[in-house]
Amino acid sequence: MWQLLLPTALLLLVSAGMRTEDLPKAVVFLEPQWYSVLEKDSVTLKCQGAYSPEDNSTQWFHNENLISSQASSYFIDAATVNDSGEYRCQTNLSTLSDPVQLEVHIGWLLLQAPRWVFKEEDPIHLRCHSWKNTALHKVTYLQNGKDRKYFHHNSDFHIPKATLKDSGSYFCRGLVGSKNVSSETVNITITQGLAVSTISSFSPPGYQVSFCLVMVLLFAVDTGLYFSVKTNI
């Protein structure tokens, strides 16, 4: 039994080896969630991926250029325009992530959102962000040139359930001291049908299946060895 089991087990162990197509794709997250920021803002990019016990390093890429940082989080302390671009990450047991775009703007105000395309009934979260978080008051959010929401003190604007009527061009304005400032205009689109995916789910089925198969086969080999030795005794 043992003589037959060992070659079969070894063959299956080799076939259970990880292939590139079996590896999960790494995912990049932004903290805070805004992918449009102002100069001097701090941004943290986090890489979610699978690691082996021997190697927990992370490869980061900015505009396809390798970044020296090997930590799972990449921290930008004071963003500049040069930090704009595509960011990707990869671990030794994950393939290269999809790109995440970071946009660094110059100005007093920036209208921020986690994305610009939503589906009907999605919640929409808008933020009128000031440079270096300077105090801002008498803030107005405008849609298609018309006042949509007013706050005496700066506050985020929430739309609980989006409708097709919420599509359009948006910007915000307010007072910094006595200076009247406005953000650039952005376009928000509301779609019908399936939800717009913003964060890829992370699930490494290929790795888990292969690992479980290896463990089962190792158990089978040990069991076969035990009975073989017992029979010989």
Swiss-Prot record:
Membrane topology: Lipid-anchor; GPI-anchor
GO biological process: antibody-dependent cellular cytotoxicity; cell surface receptor signaling pathway; immune response
GO molecular function: GPI anchor binding; IgG binding; IgG receptor activity
UniProt-annotated glycosylation sites, renumbered to this chain: N56, N63, N82, N92, N180, N187
Post-translational modification note: Glycosylated. Glycosylation plays an inhibitory role in the interaction with IgG3. The soluble form is produced by a proteolytic cleavage.
Effect of mutating A78D: In allele FCGR3B*03
Tissue distribution of the protein: Expressed specifically by polymorphonuclear leukocytes (neutrophils). Also expressed by stimulated eosinophils.
InterPro entries: Ig-like_dom, Ig-like_dom_sf, Ig-like_fold, Ig_Fc_receptor, Ig_sub
The keyword Plastid is assigned to this record: no
Propeptide residue span(s): 201-233
Entry's Gene Ontology cellular component terms: external side of plasma membrane; extracellular exosome; extracellular region; plasma membrane; secretory granule membrane
Signal peptide range in chain numbering: 1-16
Quaternary structure (record): Monomer. Interacts with INPP5D/SHIP1.
Additional record remark: Encoded by one of two nearly identical genes: FCGR3A and FCGR3B (Shown here) which are expressed in a tissue-specific manner. The 'Phe-203' in FCGR3A determines the transmembrane domains whereas the Ser-203 in FCGR3B determines the GPI-anchoring.
Functional note: Receptor for the Fc region of immunoglobulins gamma. Low affinity receptor. Binds complexed or aggregated IgG and also monomeric IgG. Contrary to III-A, is not capable to mediate antibody-dependent cytotoxicity and phagocytosis. May serve as a trap for immune complexes in the peripheral circulation which does not activate neutrophils.
Protein name: Low affinity immunoglobulin gamma Fc region receptor III-B
Source organism per UniProt: Homo sapiens
Encoding gene per record: FCGR3B
